[in-house]
Amino acid sequence: MQKLVKIVLVFLVITSACKSVKKVQIIETQIFKKDTAQTVVISEAPKVDSAKIVKDIMTKLVKRKIDFTSFNAKINVDYETAENTQKMTAYVSLKKDSALFVKIAVSPYGVVENIYVNKDSVILIRTKGEKSIQYSAISYLQETTNIPFDFSTLQDILVGNPIFLDSNIVSYKSNSTQLLVYLVGNLFKNLVTLDNTDYKVMHSKLDDVDENRNRTCDITLSNYLPVNGNQFATYRTISVSEKSKLDISLDFKQYDFNNPLQYRFAIPTNYKPKKPVEKKPVAKKTASKK
Protein backbone atom coordinates (compact mmCIF):
# COMPACT_ATOMS: atom_id res chain seq x y z
CA MET A 1 0.00 0.00 0.00
CA GLN A 2 2.86 2.40 0.67
CA LYS A 3 4.00 1.91 -2.92
CA LEU A 4 0.49 2.85 -4.11
CA VAL A 5 0.48 5.95 -1.92
CA LYS A 6 3.81 7.09 -3.38
CA ILE A 7 2.46 6.52 -6.90
CA VAL A 8 -0.55 8.75 -6.23
CA LEU A 9 1.62 11.51 -4.74
CA VAL A 10 4.15 11.25 -7.54
CA PHE A 11 1.64 11.67 -10.34
CA LEU A 12 -0.09 14.53 -8.56
CA VAL A 13 3.18 16.39 -8.89
CA ILE A 14 4.82 15.05 -12.01
CA THR A 15 4.05 18.10 -14.13
CA SER A 16 6.23 20.37 -12.02
CA ALA A 17 9.43 19.48 -13.86
CA CYS A 18 9.34 22.06 -16.67
CA LYS A 19 12.04 24.75 -16.60
CA SER A 20 12.61 27.74 -18.85
CA VAL A 21 14.03 28.36 -22.28
CA LYS A 22 14.20 31.59 -24.26
CA LYS A 23 12.63 31.37 -27.74
CA VAL A 24 9.02 32.07 -28.73
CA GLN A 25 7.66 30.84 -32.06
CA ILE A 26 4.53 29.30 -33.63
CA ILE A 27 3.85 25.55 -33.44
CA GLU A 28 3.40 24.00 -36.86
CA THR A 29 3.59 20.37 -35.75
CA GLN A 30 2.06 19.20 -32.48
CA ILE A 31 3.90 16.63 -30.37
CA PHE A 32 1.43 13.86 -29.83
CA LYS A 33 3.81 10.93 -30.34
CA LYS A 34 7.12 10.53 -28.62
CA ASP A 35 8.86 9.40 -31.77
CA THR A 36 7.96 12.69 -33.44
CA ALA A 37 9.14 14.89 -30.59
CA GLN A 38 12.49 15.53 -32.24
CA THR A 39 11.08 16.43 -35.68
CA VAL A 40 8.84 19.35 -34.79
CA VAL A 41 8.85 21.97 -37.53
CA ILE A 42 8.69 25.53 -36.22
CA SER A 43 8.37 28.55 -38.47
CA GLU A 44 8.85 32.19 -37.60
CA ALA A 45 5.80 34.44 -37.31
CA PRO A 46 6.68 37.76 -38.95
CA LYS A 47 4.91 40.95 -37.85
CA VAL A 48 3.65 39.27 -34.67
CA ASP A 49 4.63 40.66 -31.27
CA SER A 50 5.36 37.28 -29.69
CA ALA A 51 6.53 38.77 -26.40
CA LYS A 52 3.22 40.63 -25.99
CA ILE A 53 1.20 37.51 -26.81
CA VAL A 54 3.14 35.41 -24.30
CA LYS A 55 2.78 38.10 -21.63
CA ASP A 56 -0.97 38.14 -22.25
CA ILE A 57 -1.20 34.35 -21.96
CA MET A 58 0.72 34.29 -18.68
CA THR A 59 -1.32 37.19 -17.26
CA LYS A 60 -4.59 35.38 -17.95
CA LEU A 61 -3.26 32.16 -16.42
CA VAL A 62 -2.26 34.02 -13.26
CA LYS A 63 -5.70 35.62 -13.02
CA ARG A 64 -7.47 32.24 -13.11
CA LYS A 65 -5.30 30.78 -10.34
CA ILE A 66 -7.46 29.72 -7.39
CA ASP A 67 -6.64 31.65 -4.22
CA PHE A 68 -7.59 29.80 -1.04
CA THR A 69 -6.81 29.28 2.63
CA SER A 70 -7.98 25.67 2.95
CA PHE A 71 -9.26 22.83 0.77
CA ASN A 72 -11.18 19.61 1.47
CA ALA A 73 -11.95 16.84 -1.01
CA LYS A 74 -13.20 13.29 -1.34
CA ILE A 75 -11.59 11.68 -4.39
CA ASN A 76 -12.36 8.32 -5.99
CA VAL A 77 -9.04 7.01 -7.27
CA ASP A 78 -8.65 4.21 -9.83
CA TYR A 79 -5.27 2.94 -10.92
CA GLU A 80 -4.38 0.20 -13.34
CA THR A 81 -1.14 -1.49 -14.34
CA ALA A 82 -0.44 -4.59 -16.40
CA GLU A 83 -0.34 -6.61 -13.17
CA ASN A 84 -2.95 -4.98 -10.95
CA THR A 85 -6.08 -2.86 -10.72
CA GLN A 86 -6.99 -0.98 -7.55
CA LYS A 87 -9.83 1.28 -6.47
CA MET A 88 -9.60 3.48 -3.41
CA THR A 89 -10.93 6.68 -1.90
CA ALA A 90 -8.71 9.56 -0.81
CA TYR A 91 -9.95 12.03 1.80
CA VAL A 92 -7.89 15.21 1.53
CA SER A 93 -7.57 18.25 3.79
CA LEU A 94 -5.10 20.97 2.86
CA LYS A 95 -4.07 24.08 4.75
CA LYS A 96 -2.39 26.42 2.30
CA ASP A 97 1.40 26.61 2.58
CA SER A 98 1.32 24.54 5.75
CA ALA A 99 0.00 20.97 5.91
CA LEU A 100 -1.65 18.24 3.85
CA PHE A 101 -3.67 15.39 5.41
CA VAL A 102 -4.70 12.40 3.27
CA LYS A 103 -6.69 9.35 4.40
CA ILE A 104 -6.59 6.35 2.06
CA ALA A 105 -9.61 4.02 2.26
CA VAL A 106 -9.97 0.68 0.47
CA SER A 107 -13.17 -1.36 0.43
CA PRO A 108 -14.08 -3.33 2.52
CA TYR A 109 -11.33 -2.44 5.02
CA GLY A 110 -11.94 1.27 5.43
CA VAL A 111 -9.02 3.63 6.06
CA VAL A 112 -5.78 1.66 5.65
CA GLU A 113 -3.24 4.48 5.59
CA ASN A 114 -2.86 8.12 6.54
CA ILE A 115 -0.42 10.52 4.92
CA TYR A 116 0.82 13.78 6.39
CA VAL A 117 2.90 16.18 4.29
CA ASN A 118 4.36 19.57 5.13
CA LYS A 119 7.06 21.69 3.53
CA ASP A 120 9.84 19.53 4.94
CA SER A 121 8.59 16.01 5.54
CA VAL A 122 6.29 13.13 4.64
CA ILE A 123 4.79 10.78 7.24
CA LEU A 124 3.15 7.50 6.17
CA ILE A 125 0.96 5.85 8.81
CA ARG A 126 -0.30 2.32 8.23
CA THR A 127 -3.53 1.92 10.21
CA LYS A 128 -4.48 -1.68 9.32
CA GLY A 129 -2.62 -4.97 9.69
CA GLU A 130 0.88 -4.43 11.06
CA LYS A 131 0.49 -0.83 12.18
CA SER A 132 3.57 1.26 11.50
CA ILE A 133 4.75 4.82 10.95
CA GLN A 134 7.41 6.01 8.52
CA TYR A 135 9.10 9.41 8.74
CA SER A 136 10.82 10.81 5.66
CA ALA A 137 12.10 14.14 4.41
CA ILE A 138 10.13 15.43 1.43
CA SER A 139 13.34 14.95 -0.55
CA TYR A 140 12.84 11.19 -0.13
CA LEU A 141 10.01 11.18 -2.67
CA GLN A 142 12.08 13.37 -4.96
CA GLU A 143 15.00 10.95 -4.76
CA THR A 144 12.93 7.81 -5.29
CA THR A 145 11.07 9.23 -8.29
CA ASN A 146 13.76 11.48 -9.80
CA ILE A 147 11.12 14.20 -10.10
CA PRO A 148 11.73 17.55 -8.37
CA PHE A 149 8.78 19.13 -6.60
CA ASP A 150 7.91 21.05 -3.45
CA PHE A 151 4.90 21.56 -1.20
CA SER A 152 3.74 24.62 -3.11
CA THR A 153 3.59 22.69 -6.39
CA LEU A 154 1.77 19.80 -4.72
CA GLN A 155 -0.98 22.03 -3.34
CA ASP A 156 -1.40 23.83 -6.66
CA ILE A 157 -1.96 20.53 -8.46
CA LEU A 158 -4.47 19.33 -5.87
CA VAL A 159 -6.64 22.43 -6.28
CA GLY A 160 -6.15 22.48 -10.06
CA ASN A 161 -3.94 25.54 -10.40
CA PRO A 162 -1.57 25.76 -13.39
CA ILE A 163 1.92 24.84 -12.27
CA PHE A 164 4.16 25.93 -15.18
CA LEU A 165 4.02 29.70 -14.62
CA ASP A 166 7.78 29.90 -13.94
CA SER A 167 8.55 28.56 -17.42
CA ASN A 168 9.01 30.57 -20.59
CA ILE A 169 6.81 29.60 -23.52
CA VAL A 170 8.77 28.19 -26.44
CA SER A 171 5.94 27.92 -28.97
CA TYR A 172 2.21 28.42 -29.25
CA LYS A 173 -0.66 27.88 -31.66
CA SER A 174 -4.17 29.28 -31.37
CA ASN A 175 -7.48 28.41 -33.00
CA SER A 176 -11.10 29.24 -32.23
CA THR A 177 -11.38 26.79 -29.32
CA GLN A 178 -7.89 25.89 -28.10
CA LEU A 179 -4.50 27.36 -27.37
CA LEU A 180 -1.51 25.01 -27.60
CA VAL A 181 1.50 26.04 -25.54
CA TYR A 182 4.81 24.21 -25.87
CA LEU A 183 7.50 24.26 -23.17
CA VAL A 184 10.86 22.52 -22.96
CA GLY A 185 12.60 22.06 -19.62
CA ASN A 186 15.53 20.19 -18.17
CA LEU A 187 13.53 16.98 -17.76
CA PHE A 188 10.45 17.17 -19.97
CA LYS A 189 8.99 18.56 -23.16
CA ASN A 190 5.50 19.73 -22.25
CA LEU A 191 2.68 20.41 -24.70
CA VAL A 192 -0.21 22.07 -22.85
CA THR A 193 -3.71 22.54 -24.28
CA LEU A 194 -5.73 25.46 -22.90
CA ASP A 195 -9.34 26.43 -23.49
CA ASN A 196 -9.15 29.52 -25.68
CA THR A 197 -12.12 31.15 -23.96
CA ASP A 198 -11.11 31.24 -20.30
CA TYR A 199 -7.67 29.56 -20.36
CA LYS A 200 -8.63 26.42 -18.44
CA VAL A 201 -5.93 23.73 -18.64
CA MET A 202 -7.45 20.83 -20.62
CA HIS A 203 -4.48 18.58 -21.36
CA SER A 204 -0.76 18.26 -20.75
CA LYS A 205 1.57 15.88 -22.56
CA LEU A 206 5.08 15.39 -21.25
CA ASP A 207 7.94 13.58 -22.99
CA ASP A 208 11.34 12.98 -21.48
CA VAL A 209 14.11 15.22 -22.78
CA ASP A 210 16.60 12.42 -22.20
CA GLU A 211 16.66 10.39 -25.42
CA ASN A 212 17.88 7.34 -23.50
CA ARG A 213 14.66 7.19 -21.47
CA ASN A 214 11.14 6.41 -22.65
CA ARG A 215 9.22 8.30 -19.95
CA THR A 216 5.95 9.91 -21.06
CA CYS A 217 2.95 11.31 -19.22
CA ASP A 218 -0.50 12.38 -20.42
CA ILE A 219 -2.69 14.42 -18.07
CA THR A 220 -6.27 15.40 -18.90
CA LEU A 221 -8.47 17.74 -16.83
CA SER A 222 -12.22 17.89 -17.48
CA ASN A 223 -15.68 18.38 -15.99
CA TYR A 224 -14.93 21.92 -14.84
CA LEU A 225 -17.50 23.33 -12.42
CA PRO A 226 -17.77 26.78 -10.80
CA VAL A 227 -16.63 26.92 -7.16
CA ASN A 228 -16.37 30.20 -5.25
CA GLY A 229 -16.09 32.14 -8.49
CA ASN A 230 -13.40 29.81 -9.89
CA GLN A 231 -13.40 26.91 -12.36
CA PHE A 232 -12.46 23.58 -10.74
CA ALA A 233 -11.60 20.39 -12.70
CA THR A 234 -13.59 17.62 -11.03
CA TYR A 235 -12.19 14.79 -13.18
CA ARG A 236 -8.56 14.11 -14.11
CA THR A 237 -6.82 11.22 -15.83
CA ILE A 238 -3.11 10.48 -15.79
CA SER A 239 -1.35 7.95 -18.01
CA VAL A 240 2.34 7.33 -17.41
CA SER A 241 4.67 4.96 -19.17
CA GLU A 242 8.35 4.17 -19.05
CA LYS A 243 9.27 0.51 -18.61
CA SER A 244 5.60 -0.20 -17.86
CA LYS A 245 2.32 1.70 -18.11
CA LEU A 246 0.23 3.12 -15.28
CA ASP A 247 -3.23 4.69 -15.65
CA ILE A 248 -4.78 6.75 -12.85
CA SER A 249 -8.12 8.55 -12.66
CA LEU A 250 -9.08 11.10 -10.00
CA ASP A 251 -12.83 11.72 -9.64
CA PHE A 252 -13.54 14.55 -7.17
CA LYS A 253 -16.87 13.63 -5.55
CA GLN A 254 -16.82 16.32 -2.84
CA TYR A 255 -14.75 19.49 -2.60
CA ASP A 256 -14.84 22.85 -0.86
CA PHE A 257 -12.58 25.81 -0.20
CA ASN A 258 -11.94 28.05 2.80
CA ASN A 259 -13.74 25.85 5.33
CA PRO A 260 -12.38 24.09 8.46
CA LEU A 261 -10.23 21.03 7.72
CA GLN A 262 -12.45 17.92 7.73
CA TYR A 263 -9.94 15.07 7.59
CA ARG A 264 -7.23 16.00 10.06
CA PHE A 265 -5.75 13.21 12.18
CA ALA A 266 -3.30 12.92 15.06
CA ILE A 267 0.16 11.45 14.53
CA PRO A 268 0.27 8.29 16.70
CA THR A 269 3.11 7.92 19.19
CA ASN A 270 2.79 4.19 19.84
CA TYR A 271 3.21 2.84 16.29
CA LYS A 272 6.27 0.88 15.26
CA PRO A 273 8.68 3.15 13.33
CA LYS A 274 9.52 1.94 9.85
CA LYS A 275 12.56 3.15 7.94
CA PRO A 276 12.23 4.17 4.28
CA VAL A 277 13.63 1.71 1.79
CA GLU A 278 16.94 3.16 0.68
CA LYS A 279 18.26 2.84 -2.83
CA LYS A 280 21.17 0.51 -3.00
CA PRO A 281 24.19 2.05 -4.70
CA VAL A 282 25.22 0.39 -7.92
CA ALA A 283 28.49 -1.42 -7.43
CA LYS A 284 31.19 -0.28 -9.79
CA LYS A 285 32.99 -2.94 -11.74
CA THR A 286 36.73 -3.02 -11.23
CA ALA A 287 39.15 -4.23 -13.80
CA SER A 288 40.72 -7.56 -12.91
CA LYS A 289 44.42 -7.56 -12.33
CA LYS A 290 46.48 -9.68 -14.64
Ranges and model annotations:
Residues Q2-V10:
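Sec-dependent signal peptide recognition
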Residues K19-N76, E80-T85, K275-K290:
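N-terminal leader/targeting segments and the immediate start of mature chains
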Residues S20-E28, V170-K279:
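Gly/Pro-enriched, hydrophobic low-complexity segments
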Residues D35-T36, S50, S98, S121, ...:
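Coil residues (strongly favoring Ser/Thr
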Residues I57, K128-K189, I267-T269:
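Flexible, processing/modification-adjacent segments and terminal tails
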